Each structure stands twice: as C-alpha cells, then as structure tokens.
Amino acid sequence: MTESQKNIPVASDDQSDSHEFQNEWRMEMHEWVESLQAVKDSYSEREVKELLRELQNFALSHGISLSEATLNTPYRNTIPLSEQPSYPGDIEMESKIENIIRWNAMAMVLQAYDLGEGLGGHIATYASTATMTEVALNHFIKSRTENYQGDMLNIQAHSSPGIYSRAFLEGRLSIEEIGNFRRELQKDGGLPSYPHPRRRPELWPSPTASMGLNGVSSIYYARFSKYLENRGLLSKKGGKIWAFLGDGEMDEPETIGTINIASREKLDNLIFVVNCNLQRLDGPVRGNGKIIQELEAVFRGSGWDVIKVIWGSEWDPLFAIDQNDVMQRRMDEVLDGEYQMYSVSSGEDQRAHWVKDNNELESIMTNLSNDELKDIKRGGFDHKKLYAAFDRASKSSGKPTVILVKTLKGYGLGEGSEGRNIAHQKKTMSDEERVEIAERLGIPLSKEECISAKFYVPDQDSEEMRYMHKMRQKLGGYQPVRHEEYKSLKAPDLNQFSDFTDGIDRSISTTLALVRMMSKMLRDEKIGPYLVPIIPDEARTFGMDGLFSQAGIYSPSGQNYEPVDAGTISPYKEAKDGQILQEGICEAGALASFMAAGTAYSHSELPMIPIYIFYSIFGMQRVGDMVWACGDAMTKGFLIGGTAGRTTLNGEGVQHQDGHSHVLASVVPNMMTYDPAFAYELAV
C-alpha cells in the first residue's frame, strides 16, 4: 500500500454520513479535481478526455456501473456564468412587450370562455413558455431572405394563443380574428385552436397537434433539408428547424423513438427546445424523479448536444459561495414533485424543506430573504440564461441540439394557477384575478376593461411597437410563416406510359407495373430529379431492389463498405446524393419524410414528388394520425399500399390482412383514394 493510499478515508456504511468523514472525503475529491485541472493546464482537451475514459474503463472493469455519471451532469445550467455572452437586447423593453402579449393571449381564452359556449382554450402553457419564445423571436429565429433559406418555427401546440397574440401586435391578425378564437366560421373570420396550416396557411408551417407529431416531423424536416442539399437541389444557405415541445409530450414514442436518426445523420440544423414546467395535463411529469435529468440521459446517450437552463441569474451568487457543493447536492436530490411543491409554498416553508438540518446550506441560503426565495426565477424566465443557450445551440456543428428549459406552468397567473395540477385546465378567472394580473403586467386598462378581458394595443409609434418591428426586421421578417411561392412542374404526357396504357400481353402484378413506371419516371429529365421514393425496409418485398443501383439509397456519409451483393445486378448502393429514402422499420419516420418531401414546395420552393410504398396494413392503420397531419399540412404526394386485400397474405395472419384501408382513408378530406386492378389504371 502506498503512502497516498493510506491517507484515503475509508468508512463503513454507518460511518459514511458522519461529518468528519464527509470533510475528509471532500478534501480527497478536491485533490482529484486539482490534479485534473493540472492535466488540463498542461495538455489539451483530448488528453483530459483520454484520462477520464481510462478512469471510466477502470471502474467498469471492476464492476462499478457509471451509466448515471456518464450521461448526467449536475442539476444546474450547462453554461456557467463565466461563459455567458452579454445580452444584446433591451431586457426591460422586451419584458414590457412580453407582458402585453401575455395579457392578450390570456384575454383571447377568457373572452371565448365568457361567451358561455364551452369553447375551451389553454392559458397556462404559454404563460410558462412566453419568455423563451420572445427571446427566440427577438434574437434568433430568422425569416427567408435572398441569402438565407429561413428558419422553420414549430411551436408547442397549447401555446398557440401567445403566437396569435404576437401576430396581432405585429399587424398580421385583426382584432376580429383573435376575438373569434376557436370560432373560425364567424363573419369576420376566426382562429383555430392549434397550428393548422390548412386553416391558416399564411401562418403555420406545420401542424404540431396532436402531441408527439411536432418532434418527429421536425426531425425529418431537418433531415430532408440536408437531403436536398446533398442532392444539389437546394443551395446551402443555412436555415434551422426550431421545435418547441413540452416535457409531457416527450413520452410520445414518435418523438423519443426517432431521435437517433438526427444524431446519426449529424442534423446540426435541428434545435429542440423542451419546456420543462414539470407538469402534464393531470399532474407531475415525473413526480418521483427528475424529467430534465432523464431527458438529458436519453438525448446525450443518443448523441445530441444537451444544454440545460435550470436556474435564473439570482442563483449565481449562491453558486459562487457553494464551495463544498452542499447546495448542488441538494439540488441534485430534490425530486420534481418537491420542486412543484415549492412553487405553491411560502418562502418560509420552502426554506424549511430545502435546508432541513444542514447548517452549511442554511448559511448559504441566508443570502436570500423568504420573499426573495419565493420569487426567485427558474431559468426559463431569465433572458440572459436563455440567450446563452440559444446562442450556443445556433452555433452547433455536426450534432443536433436539445435545450432543456425549466419553467413553471401558469407562471404569472397568480397563486390560484401557478404550479397547480389544475393549471392546464384553467380557462377562466375571477374578476379580482383579472384586475390583479393586469396590474402586475402593467397593462393600462380600467377595472371594467380588465374584467371584460379587453385586448390592449400600444400606439403604433410607441417604443414597444417600434422595438418589436425593428427586431423582426433585423431577422428578415415575421415568424412563424408559411410560403407558397414555388416552381411548378408539367405533368408528363400520357403517351410516355403507353407501355402500360396499351395493355401487356401477359399477367403482371400491379406492384411490378408500378416499379417499372417509377424506373421510367426516374429517367425523365424533367420530373426525375424531383421524385422521392420512400421505403420502410420493404423494397425487396415489392421487387424494387432494382432501383437501388439506378437511383441510389440516400446516406449523408456515402457508402464506406462494400456490400455483400456488390457483384449482383442490384447491389445495395448507398450514396451521399442517393435519391431513395430507405427508412428502415420506422413507419412514423417514413410518413414524416413523406410530409417533409410533400411540403417542400413551401419550405424549400421545390416541387418534390414523394412516393411512399408500404405494406398496406401498416399505412392508415399504423400511422393514421400522421396521415391526417399530412392532409393538414397540404402535403402533395402518393401513398401506395402494396399487398392489400383480405386474402393476399393469408398465411401471415390477420395482422397482415388489409381490407379496410380505404375506409380509414375516406375520412381524410383532401386525400383521394383509388384501388387499381390494372397497370393502365396506375398510369392514368
């Protein structure tokens, strides 16, 4: 045993909590950190990583699990104060504008409720996401210009009143329209509940409800943009996909189940912003755990860059004096259910539960009064912390980024709503609450106007309005926005398909006829480049493997191996400029690719023609919600269900027998359905 080993503190389980042992152990850890700092100072970052990897391998080889340690960082902001950039805007002015938007968003729902028609609406979600949305819209999310492709903003669906409220201030929506929230058939028009492009085609780029659709569609929008660039159809002028999501909807399998492709294909044009207000519709997201830590591990393990925004600036002085990480350890151990409890507790009660019997932590917390402790901000309401996170995410290279932002559901709505389990269902307020909130937000309305939830608009020449317009002009225009200018294609003459329309002298399957048509169209100089074959790992089933060598399978990294069938007439050919989207066994991802390709006329000004070919039973029945979303997004393309019928695949069992897809498809209003039996019907 070496001399240094003799000095390492050793304790049994019943001694490890003693004050003496804890002091010795903190000193030991401090020495290790100092040693690591010395390595960092003397060598490069690469050597530090190599050393840590060696230590990790040592621990694993001795049966010590490190899964939590390697995938989770402490429960604090990822970006320390020392690396925080200066804020480029006027926080006081931006807060005034945000308060006006908050009031009008709330007023929309209150006015709808006051009609007594049971229209519904949601107030609490936007209340929690308002600051992060405003920081993004004032400083980051760019519109399309001559030199920039433009960003796509996909919002958390329940926060739509806030986006409508901002568009109203910007002059993009009339007072009649926002006054008719959820009443679209009124004489002067109205607004749909959530982002529906078919209902408001000038505003919403993509449908983000129902929950779960936003994540998967945003991933595949980002991926399709890279696809277009790698095929030389879209110039590399930038453009990011910003997806704002809720922590509750991250449980949707369509979201978490598709995040791997984003890191695998290095989608650095994709940013997820997860609003971690710790609550879903009925109660806590993870009352017995920590949703931010859970999501960090999931995304970090999938190869994403993870940025956490948990604490506001008021915590920075406390971190500075937390030399022994006493406060940090308390932050790490408190559960989300307890953090939610803090949001509805007095400062005195918070302090008692937070400090318990820890004298050192109590000493740190004496720097805050009970009132200050009650009002201290979470990171999601701190402009500076949000700006730092968005700034780093927007500069990411080679990886997608997820920003996990801690907020409070119902923030600013008073003690009757903030952090309460009923916050999501809050649709009205008492007269006293309305007046109190208006006063707190600084809205200059009379008591009667507050009670009636009157909309408030500053003078067009006011400082607030000038600032808001100026910030959007700097970023190229207003957001969110959907474009309709695109290049059109002329349909090929029918005589190009004479091989099929004139009849064939022998019986062939309609699937074979379809593959031959696709092969012919891919060779057409006018429409061939715009064709996007999409296959969920069923190309050989449908006899489409011959297209592999003709069109190539898209892979952003090309093909760095020799396929086992390299010497055959239809080798598995992957290429950076490949045309076929081989989605693997992921129908949700395939439909998301179909949506991205079929709406390329809007987001990329290209008339792409997606043709998604699948086992018919795994179409409408498997991803019907995504198909409906494609209709809402006004997607243009062809869905081809192969091997249909109740008897076609009898041996496969009832889960493969399809006699009802057309019944399911018939309820999608803008989806035309056919059941072709002959090759000429496919051609026509």
Which functions belong to the PLM regions below?
Residues 172-184, 264-275, 300-304, 628-646:
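A glycine-rich helix N-cap at a beta->alpha junction
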Residues 168-172, 257-262, 286-296, 313-316, ...:
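Short secondary-structure boundary/capping segments
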Residues 157-161, 185, 245-252, 275-280, ...:
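Acidic, glycine-rich active-site loops and adjacent beta-strand->loop/helix elements
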Residues 79, 83-105, 126, 144, ...:
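Non-catalytic terminal/interface segments that mediate subunit docking, oligomerization
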